């Protein structure tokens, strides 16, 4: 090992030295962090329960639902289940506090608002909004709920801000299912694009941003792009590989003097991309990944798009990204393959962004800036991963409308606390990561809640026994058969 590599190894390891100040008073920080959210609730019981539930979401529990959290923090199971599942408190004031805190810490003029759906697989048919639909979590059509999320991506970090439950159209028309799951009367069916626009209209002025981004589920709808342009928003939206475009920078066919002058033909973005010369791609380094720099190749071209019913649409920039499916050394081994086989060694993504700004002037965003916006989509996926792996985002056991929204709001708040503590800890330990902050905090909470006395152990066991016996009782009652009491055993 050369001296330079040895020095860098030493530097990296020194960045991992954890000062006691990183975790000192972290439990107190959580208590102080919760105060603004407690003030958003009206009852003392709600203020107490929000702190306990957040502590449970940040704990060591394998399944972070109301029952498991209640056992950890030593409160009655029904108390937390009612608080999350059916209590009539409004989650929106808590979201308002969250948005304010995220903007205060991360806000920047050219920040990025990112929209993305996330699915939650379910087995039954009684949870609000559940239906056989596309489940991105499993990569197929399956029984699931889908939430639409609004995130904020800055250069320093990212966070989820707001959300909407995607209520399918057949659910919106079913009065019996709506009543069973407590769906409010004023809630009607809205497309996911409409839900994104609703959140943008609600928070757009408060959240400083220069771009809006989303995947091809949103970008394929021309009306959604049109609505963003009408609001003066700059966007980078994914589109399917079948999207029809006309290359406005390609040579136009020669005019023969009769009829209308010919125009470049319509073709799919995939067919258009396959005609490109290999030299037109520009290589950029997006970020430094765990296994080295992550590079992509990009191209930008001014095109005309189509509206519904094959009507001619506006001019937009088509942006194509190319990333290898394997590392560079593996690609060199495929140099002898023909063009089609070499093309299969890459993953392509297609995006559209407006050519004109709010004042109608032609915009020329740089490839580096477009790459930054495209990368924001990956940041939102990372936010989902944080929520699901560190704060039990997908581990709820509720069926009602309010239960789903209560759990989601508290999950986003819990993750934001981890982000805040990670930023604080990185001042002393630069290599500190959010999962390690959650791990350290969970150990501290274990010490707080698990100093068990004989009396508390008896309460834990009693709750489990009562749960089991009540289940046995209701099963027997359904069959109109009186359950037998269990006999006390005499010690011989």
Give the label of every model feature segment.
Residues 2-84:
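Gly/serine-rich nucleotide phosphate-binding loop at the start of the catalytic core
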Residues 83-169, 174:
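Active-site-proximal, Lys/Arg-enriched surface segment
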Residues 205, 223-234:
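Short, surface-exposed basic-aromatic patches at helix termini and helix-loop junctions that form
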Residues 393-451:
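Basic, amphipathic alpha-helical segments enriched in Lys/Arg and hydrophobic/aromatic residues
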């Amino acid at each position: 090992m050369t001296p330079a590599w040895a020095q860098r190894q030493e530097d990296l390891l020194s960045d991992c030295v954890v000062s006691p100040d990183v975790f000192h008073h972290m439990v107190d920080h959580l208590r102080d962090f919760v105060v603004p959210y407690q003030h958003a609730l009206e009852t003392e019981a709600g203020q107490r329960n929000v702190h306990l539930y957040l502590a449970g979401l940040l704990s060591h529990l394998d399944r972070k639902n109301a029952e498991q959290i209640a056992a950890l923090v030593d409160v009655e199971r029904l108390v937390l289940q009612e608080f999350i599942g059916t209590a009539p408190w409004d989650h929106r004031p808590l979201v308002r506090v969250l948005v304010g805190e995220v903007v205060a810490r991360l806000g920047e003029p050219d920040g990025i608002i990112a929209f993305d759906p996330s699915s939650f697989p379910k087995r039954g048919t009684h949870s609000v909004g559940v239906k056989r639909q596309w489940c991105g979590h499993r990569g197929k059509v399956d029984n699931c709920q889908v939430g639409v999320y609004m995130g904020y991506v800055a250069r320093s970090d990212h966070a989820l801000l707001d959300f909407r439950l995607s209520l399918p159209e057949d659910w919106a028309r079913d009065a019996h299912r709506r009543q069973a799951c407590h769906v409010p009367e004023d809630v009607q069916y809205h497309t996911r694009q409409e839900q994104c626009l609703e959140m943008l209209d609600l928070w757009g002025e408060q959240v400083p941003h220069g771009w809006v981004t989303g995947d091809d589920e949103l970008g394929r709808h021309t009306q959604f792009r049109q609505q963003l342009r009408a609001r003066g928003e700059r966007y980078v939206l994914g589109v399917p590989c079948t999207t029809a475009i006309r290359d406005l920078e390609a040579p136009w066919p020669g005019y023969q003097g009769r009829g209308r002058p010919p125009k470049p033909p319509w073709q799919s973005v995939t067919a258009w991309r396959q005609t490109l010369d290999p030299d037109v791609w520009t290589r950029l380094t997006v970020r430094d990944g765990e296994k080295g720099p992550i590079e992509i190749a990009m191209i930008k071209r001014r095109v005309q798009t189509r509206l519904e019913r094959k009507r001619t649409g506006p001019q937009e920039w088509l942006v194509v990204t190319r990333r290898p499916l394997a590392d560079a050394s593996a690609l060199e081994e495929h140099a002898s393959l023909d063009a089609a086989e070499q093309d299969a060694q890459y993953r392509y993504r297609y995006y559209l962004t407006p050519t004109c700004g709010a004042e109608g002037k032609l915009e020329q965003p740089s490839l580096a800036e477009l790459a930054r916006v495209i990368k924001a989509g990956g940041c939102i996926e990372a936010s989902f991963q944080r929520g699901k792996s560190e704060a039990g985002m997908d581990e709820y056991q509720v069926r009602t409308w309010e239960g789903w929204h209560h759990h989601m709001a508290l999950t986003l708040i819990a993750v934001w606390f981890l982000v805040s503590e990670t930023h604080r800890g990185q001042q002393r330990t630069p290599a500190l990561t959010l999962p390690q902050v959650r791990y350290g905090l969970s150990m501290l909470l274990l010490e707080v809640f698990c100093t068990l006395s004989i009396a508390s152990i008896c309460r834990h066991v009693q709750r489990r026994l009562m749960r089991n016996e009540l289940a046995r009782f209701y099963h027997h009652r359904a069959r109109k058969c009186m359950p037998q009491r269990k006999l006390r055993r005499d010690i011989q």
